[in-house]
Regions:
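Domain-level signal for soluble alpha/beta catalytic cores
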Residues: 1-275
Length: 275
């Protein structure tokens, strides 16, 4: 989210690269711009302005392209990370009541700024995800629910994505340098994927899908999703790891491999593909 403030020109270029690649919709860079994500950087009082300006960056990229491209507003249950760690900073984890208030604030701003869809990204639990989903649905906009999953190394079941459970390590790090294990959420629960789907779909959502998950996990997750959801499906897989020794991403599939593997997952129910 800080790139929107300190490097807006780069955000625009990233949007333009997606447009030039042929996408029909771009997503605002608001994955991590809820108030509780900005407060650790002393930007909490600029939350509304940052979200407004971030939508404007997406709109500028569309204008620059001269094409008719839709804009989706991104929201997530992402929490601010502890310094030099890959886990939420407990000093800035909001109460559920504050979390709900912050999501409603962000969703309202995104709607007022004209996004056509809200995409909820990387949902991997129930407690935080249902708060976000309810806040998004309150806007009346179409809501696309993006779930993340993995095949548990403990029992081979599909679960909400969890660093402890995933077979393929996403972050390459020295445990002596990073003594605390990576966590997506402070509770670090390993939750059955079907349970997550059914808990959330009982609340609502127009599209469900799998994102930020390895191809092998996405394939198995799709089977679970299709067994529990009859509506349209989206997906965009994870294709990079993060190496802390170089602070760079390691790409796991080239363009041809990505296309081939995505093609294997397309059917009449899968309507949306992202990258």
């Amino acid at each position: 989210g800080l790139a929107n403030v300190f490097s807006p020109e780069i955000v625009i270029k990233v949007h333009e690269s997606h447009i030039n690649a042929g996408c029909d919709m771009i997503t605002t860079n608001t994955f991590g711009t809820a108030r509780h994500c900005l407060e650790p950087s002393n930007l909490g009082d600029q939350t509304i302005k940052i979200n407004i300006d971030t939508v404007k960056l997406a709109r500028q990229a569309v204008k620059n392209s001269g094409k008719k491209i839709k804009i989706a507003g991104s929201m997530s249950t992402y929490l601010a990370l502890a310094e030099n760690e890959f886990r939420p900073d407990t000093k800035f984890v909001p109460s559920f009541a504050k979390e709900e208030k912050n999501y409603k604030e962000q969703a309202k701003v995104l709607k007022e700024e004209g996004v056509e869809v809200l995409i909820l990204e990387m949902l991997l639990d129930i407690d935080h995800a249902k708060i976000l989903l309810n806040a998004a649905l309150e806007t009346g906009l179409p809501v696309w629910v993006g779930l993340s999953c993995c095949i548990s190394k403990f029992d081979e079941t599909v679960v909400g994505r969890n660093f402890r459970a995933e077979k393929e390590r996403s972050i390459i790090y020295d445990p002596l340098k990073y003594p605390d294990e990576p966590k997506f959420l402070p509770e670090d629960k390993i939750i059955n994927f079907a349970e997550i789907i059914n808990s959330l779909k009982s609340i609502g959502g127009d599209v469900y899908g799998i994102m930020h998950s390895w191809f092998i996990d996405t394939r198995e997750g799709m089977k679970v999703l299709k067994s529990n959801w009859n509506g349209p499906i989206m997906f965009y897989p994870e294709i990079h790891k993060f190496d802390t020794s170089t602070m760079q991403a390691l790409i796991t599939e080239n363009e041809i491999e990505f296309v081939d593997k995505c093609s294997e997952l397309i059917d009449d129910q899968v309507k949306i593909i992202g990258g």
